[in-house]
Amino acid sequence: MCDDEVAALVVDNGSGMCKAGFAGDDAPRAVFPSIVGRPRHQGVMVGMGQKDSYVGDEAQSKRGILTLKYPIEHGIITNWDDMEKIWHHTFYNELRVAPEEHPILLTEAPLNPKANREKMTQIMFETFNSPAMYVAIQAVLSLYASGRTTGVVLDSGDGVSHTVPIYEGYALPHAILRLDLAGRDLTDYLMKILTERGYSFTTTAEREIVRDIKEKLCYVALDFEQEMATAAASTSLEKSYELPDGQVLTIGNERFRCPEALFQPSFLGMESCGIHETVYNTIMKCDVDIRKDLYANTVLSGGTTMYPGIADRMQKEITALAPSTIKIKIIAPPERKYSVWIGGSILASLSTFQQMWISKQEYDESGPGIVHRKCF
């Protein structure tokens, strides 16, 4: 499978970033924002070659004059025309391959509407003429990437978080829990609490600046109350950030107040459980005999689990919920930002997986519904 001629393409379409590359590689070749931007103003300069839309990094770099839209919200594709643009950009501009020559592995969030994966299948076969494709569940791929077949995965990206228990390679669908609280909500929350400091961020372009502040400066406190007290008493936790126009902004307790919303969604006005309780609830929905294995193999994946301190805090919170004699291990691989993609790369290059692909022929015979029969 190392030959690029026949290598499968692995495309992990996240709500925030699209990760794409070739099966068998150890990291994605292309990682770019899942954004489509359209000009906010009429072009005035002749011959500038203005386009009617920009995708990914190009949209990001011209964000000042564009309105940015994310076609994937909460892990579900909501704008198919824009999504096609992103796929087109992935194949032709980023990977520079002809999609009709490669099998394509796509990923999706668990508990997604069935119509979503049918439409994905249809577009791959009818628009891009792919010879074969497959749709895999993101969290399952993360577990593969960590070299396990049993464990509970907390996969938290930009648009959706979910906890998926997997036993001997099988996801247990009745115990999957989904939490519509993820990176984008934290970015919005940080925008809101920075406003309290007198910094105003409102446009879609400014939201990207706040996302950068979040990624560079935020962390999870081990003890929130104590950290708040420290922040109030001294300036030791303050950090500064230089905005694109040279202004310098200072942020203090916002650094840990923002990701604290993962553990206390009430900060965002949400009534759901925090991520620690969600993991615990997922484990409790599983058979009593396998819980011990799940507690000992709790795997974090996705960009929103990248905050410093999150693994220790998870350990502390789950220890408080679980029976006292049980061994709890939180696995936070350093490459977890891309572990879904890496798992897809592993899966698509397994010799045993080759009979799992949905071929163009099968699609022509059965239609898009085949995806529910062939892909778990």
Curated annotation (Swiss-Prot):
Propeptide, chain numbering: 1-2
Post-translational modifications: Oxidation of Met-45 to form methionine sulfoxide promotes actin filament depolymerization. Methionine sulfoxide is produced stereospecifically, but it is not known whether the (S)-S-oxide or the (R)-S-oxide is produced.
Modified residues (N-acetylaspartate): 3
E.C. designation(s): 3.6.4.-
One MF annotation (Gene Ontology) recorded for this entry: hydrolase activity
Keywords: Acetylation, ATP-binding, Cytoplasm, Cytoskeleton, Hydrolase, Nucleotide-binding, Oxidation
Top-tier EC class: hydrolase
Major localisation: cytoplasm
Function in brief: Actins are highly conserved proteins that are involved in various types of cell motility and are ubiquitously expressed in all eukaryotic cells.
Annotated PANTHER family: ACTIN
Miscellaneous information on this protein: There are at least 4 actin isoforms expressed during artemia development.
Annotated family: Belongs to the actin family.
Protein name (record): Actin, clone 205
Organism (species): Artemia sp.
